[in-house]
Structures are given as structure tokens and as C-alpha cells.
Amino acid sequence: MSNSPLLAALSRRVLVIDGAMGTSLQSCPDCHLDDWLGRENCSEILTKSRPDMIQRIHESFLEAGSDCVETNTFGANLLVGAEFDDEVVAMTRELNREGVELAKAACEKFATPSRPRFVLGSMGPGTKLVSLGQTDWDLMFQSYAEQARGLLDGGTDAFLIETCQDLLQVRCAVNACLKALDERGMGPEQVPIMVSITIEATGTMLLGSDIASAVNALRMLPIASLGLNCATGPVEMTTHVDFLCRHWDRFVSVIPNAGLPVLVDGQASYPLQPKPFAKAMRRFVEEYGVNIIGGCCGTTPEHIAALVELAGDRPPPERTPEPLPAGCSSLYGFTEFQQDNSFLIVAERTNANGSRKFKRLLDAEDWDALVSMGREELRGGSHLLDVCVDFVGRDGAVDMDQIASRYATSLNAPIMIDSTEAATIEAGLKRLGGKCVVNSINLEDGEKRLNEICPLLKAHGAACVALTIDEDPQAGMAKTAERKLEIAARIHDLFTGKWGLNEQDLLFDPLTFTIATGMEDDRRLGHETLEGIRLISERFPECGIILGLSNISFGLRPVTRAVLNSVFLHHARERGLTGAIVHASKILPRTKIDEEKWLAAEWLIFDRRGEDRPEGMDADFDPLLYFIGLFPEGEDAVEKVSLESLPLHERLQRHIIDGEDDGLPETLDEALAEMSPLDIINKHLLEGMKVVGVLFGDGRMQLPFVLQSAEVMKKAVARLEPLMEKVEGDTGRGSIVLATVSGDVHDIGKNLVDIILTNNGYTVHNIGIKQSLQQIVDALKTTNASSIGMSGLLVKSVTVMEQNLKSLNDLGITVPVILGGAALTRFHAEKRL
């Protein structure tokens, strides 16, 4: 339970934070160059040289009605001080203490029993970004910890880690504050930690993180509030504030600039005046449910007075946020554990124990080639990379530091850190700014492994894989469904109870064993794993379940393994499997597996022998031998269909459905002799894509094969597009901004619309995939287009479109909007949008 007066006040009403210290300093008539003591731009030194001026600025905002003032300590940390001189570094703790004392002295003049005033210890981002390798975690941690100690020395009411541009920097600063608090026997319940990130006009943080990535990466850290400040004015923050209020379950703050800066006589000037500023903020308080408002660059006491009038004694707004689904994130994007119509594909080849190529490149320290290998895995359809650098003779922590630092900025997928060594795991977590998954914990040595890893999970907000292994000397690796559930339940209780971690961040691995040995004890291991998945998913529906899939077929030939892996995956998903660590090439869609081989794989998995043997089989029927016998030496696992023998219209569709580009040019040339390019697309190729959509929706085709179909579709359209009749010149028919909405990477349908509209005389501005509403609005203003088109394949994209429409209305944008995508129905569009 919190005993923070600040949090108590926030539970009663909306609070107002002060305005810009920098703007106030620039306007001070008695601020002279000598006041900086030869350290120009080191504003913190003014706490020493001109305490009267700093306190006067605090008092000007308090007189305007501000509830909270920020200390003049934005850059008062070791790393920033080192850019000036050793004396500033030595004064770090003192500057922070005195900064708090000045602010407290000002607050005491205005505080009343019914209206207390609060000091927020300002902690800025510094000048070096840890994700870019400009400094490292340990140096940044020391820098922030010393600053936090000074702020606590002065008696700050809260830490405000603000203007954050790097999620890894946020996590480092939060942990430094926790360290300083722990040294005093205190916690964030007494001195809350507040975080404010900066979303640029591009719609992301400086390093490319969107608001969803930020919420996901920070939600498990013990921070009291999350908000936005700087970079833009309130209007440009609208969509991000809306998202934050809908998905963040604690206090929300909004501290914008006084509009976007303009140059006046060579100086940045902020044009938004106090009344329009407050008017733009009204929606955030009244509709969205923001708890804390204030001003950043360009805001004056007059701006704050306008906000105070807006807030009044308004009680805390009612908000019912919907937490983001369970998932993880890279710096650049959020990935749900539960994928739409698919499973979470975790690449297995970025692993020194599973890939000879990865091990060879790691041994050669060919870091660029290792990055390229990671990219290859993602191009194959993987959502995450399982990264393991453990092998004899190398320092795992050093190798993980090298690889993780490169993967963090070069790849857009989250990382699963796979190691038996806590030091290696920690090295990865200190380099990866998103929310990682740690692989793994177990009970092999009792609670020892959890005691090592769970503190790292808490400190870094990471999710975790848990293997169903315990300390039983005879049956430690759970092989029966009941044992798998028993161990899972024990881990769950420790994870959520003793360690206070969220069960949504727990993914159980109920263990996969080969069923291809022919040994009696191994025959039913596949069935037991499937039953274990069912029991665990029913008992712990909020947890994920993941498998090292290819273990099931270990010992078989590659062609045979692909079929068994695919059939086993199908049944595992039916019972609740969330994801699998597997190479995408080792999975086949059901449509490409001969029915006899599919059934034979099922007989092997479910051990259909003896009285349970399939009808018509002999009493000594052995499903393993039968299954192996279906794959003569040199035979392919995939059922081959001769496209040449099919009628033309069916052949066109099969090229798309099978993702087969061999012979595609010849098929298209034949079709062009009979029909127009547009008819080929609309009547045949799109019909093939519809089938792909149905198979994907039913779970009978996995994402990598959908992507293959998409590539063939792109090639076909690229060949047909130059042959389409095109209306030349400006027809006056209008123009449109086309975009795939935020969080969605699918663009086939959107690009087809682009081609068709362009060829019919419309002007199309196709701005690409994963476009935020701000990017769409910016494109609309830049192009002066007459309409907007939003596209998305995923179910969640419909929700994004719905929110975008609401925000467009809020922004007063009334141009026609066209929506499209596989998950969108006419009924939903007419009734909900």
C-alpha cells in the first residue's frame, strides 16, 4: 500500500505540473552570462550561482496554481556532468539535493493543508543513448543512481524520468531509482517513480519505438505514471494519449510543448498561446481520463494558469483501461503471444547448440553475418528469435552483449534470450530495449534457478519460458501429462506468488520428446505432451504454452520429420499451444500433405497399436514402421500437383494457393491471350488469395506459406500492371492517401487498390505499412488529398481503424474514408464504424 502524499492527491483530483524551466530562464532579464560560471548550457549550475532566480521561477508557477514543480536537475547526472568538467561531476549529488531544497522552499510558501504542493525530481535522458552503444547499461545506471541519491537527500516527493527517447534508458533509470530507494530501506510506495516518454512528430520515439511497444515494455516496471512530454504540441499527441489512456492501468500524464516550434529571428518560438493550449488539453482530461497535465517547452506561468482553471478541483477521471494482450516487443514493435489464426513462430537457428552455421559464425566473431542470419529467419516468417550463445570455450556474457546490441537496432523482432547462465541472460537484458522473453526457468535444482532468474525478470520487465522439470531424481523431466501439470502448477505459484510476476508473462514448455526410437517407453510421449498442453491450458488460460517442436521427430529423415512436425503442431494448437521454437521450413500446411501420410502421422502420435489399431490393419501393426515406409528414399514429403495438367483458371489460382512461381510467367501469358489483366487479377488471382485467407483463418495454412502466396501475388501483379489500360494526365477524379494501419504489415490488397485507382485516373499517395494516424494525417495535409484509404489484414487492425475514425472526427478531418481488409465485414463497417 502506498503512503505517498502525491499519490494520495492524485487519487482525489487532477494535478497540474509547472511549465518550462528553460523558457523561463531565457526570459529572465537578470540572467547574465557570468551566472553560468563558464559552463554555458549547464542550467543546473544556476542552482549554485543563482538560487534566487531558480526559486523565483518555481514560485512563478506555484503562484499560477501549479500543484507540482520540477527541480532544476534535468541534466544533473554523472554522464552529462562529464561533458563539462570534473568539478560538475563531483557536484552531481549536491546539485540534485540543492535543486530539491530550492523547490521545496518555494512549495512551502504556497502549500496549505487542503492544497499541498509537491516536488518532482527531474531526471532527463542525458546526451548518450544506451541502445545506440553510446554508453553502456552499467555506466548509465551509476549515473542515474547518483542523481537519485541526491534527489532523495533533498527530500523529493517523486522521481520524474522525463523526455525519454530510448526504452532501455527508461528501464535503466527506473532500476537506478529503485537501487537508491533500497539503500534507504524505502520503495516506490514512499517515493513514486514517474515516467514520461517523448513521441516525435514521426509518431514514434527517437529510436523508432511506437506507443504500444513502450506500454508493453514498461508495464511490468513499478512506475506510478506513464505519460508524454516534449517534441510536439497537444494536438499532435492526441492519438498517442488516446492509446495510453485505453491501455495503461495507472496514472497518465500529458506535458506538451506550446505547439510545434517555428523559427523567429533564428530562434525557436512556440506559438500556441495559453487559452488555445488549455483548450487543446481539455479533451485529454474530460474524455480520455488524463490525471496529470502540465507544460514543456515554450509554456509560461500563463499557460499553467490556464491549465489550473481547466483542472479546477476535478476528481480523478474514470477510466477502464484494457491491458494490452500478453506479448513481447522489440524497440520497434509489439508482438502478441497469441497470434491471429496462427501460432507464435520462434526461430530456432540463431542458436549455437542447434545450428552449425550460427556456431561457426559466432566462433569467427562475424557479427555482421550473424545479423544477416537473424534477418533471414525473420524473412522466413518468424515472429521472435531464440538466441543462444552457450558453448564451451567462449564467454557467453560477452558474446550475448555483442549480439544483443546489434540485434536490438538491426532487427525489428523481439528476442528470446536462451541460456543456462544468469550472467549471459543479464547481459542480453542490458542491451535489449524492448520486452524480451527469457528461456528458461525450471525446478531441476529446486527453487535455485527461479531465485537467480526471477529478480532479472522483475528488473527488466521480461517474460519467461518455464520447463516442466523438477528435482525428482527418477522423473525430473515430466513425461506424463499429470506430471507436466503438477510441475507447471508449482512453478506458477512461485512465479506469481513468491515473486509477484504476472502470469501472462509465463510460457510453459511441457517438453517434447522423440517418438521415433521404437522403444516402448517412448511410444506415447507425443500423446502425453498433447494431453499435458490441454491440461495446462485449461488450468492456466492466461499463460502461454510453447514447445521445441522438432524434438518430436528427432531421429527421422528430414523429409519424414517435416510431416510429423506439421501434424503434431496441428494437434498441439488444437489443445492450446501458443507458439513453437521451430524453423519455418520444417512446417508444411495441411493442404500440401498427402492424406495417407497425415493419417499415418496421427497413428504414430497417438500410438494406434493393438486393439486401438486402425481398421483393416494386422494385429502386429506398428505405426512407426508404417509411417517411415510411406517415404521411400528420395521421395518428397509434399504432395505434388502438376500445374500444367490443370485448366487455366484453376492453374492461376493454384499458383497463388501453393505459393508457386515456377511457370507463372507462362501461365500469365496464356491467360492474357484470353482475358484482360484486370480480369486475371479480379476473377482468378484474387480468388486464390481468398482461398489462402480461408486456410489461414481456419489454421490450415501457417504464416510463412501465406507470405509465399503473397510474394507470388506481387510477382503476378508486377507482370500484369504495365499491360493495364491507364488513364493519363490529371482527370480531376480526386486523390487518396492509402495506408496499412499501425501494427499491420500486410499490403497486397492495398497495393492492388493503388494499381487499379492509378490506372483509372486517380492520384494515389501510397505511404506504406504500419502507418500511425499521425503519419496518415501528415500525408493528407502534405498532399492535400481528397480522401483516405486505410487497410489491414489482422483482426486487431479493425480496432485500430475504429480508433482512427474517432480521432479523425476529434481532429475535425471530414474527408471521405475508405476501409478495407480481410477482417473487415460490411456488417461491422455499417454498424460499428
Each language-model region and where it sits:
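Domain-level signal for soluble alpha/beta catalytic cores
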Residues: 1-833
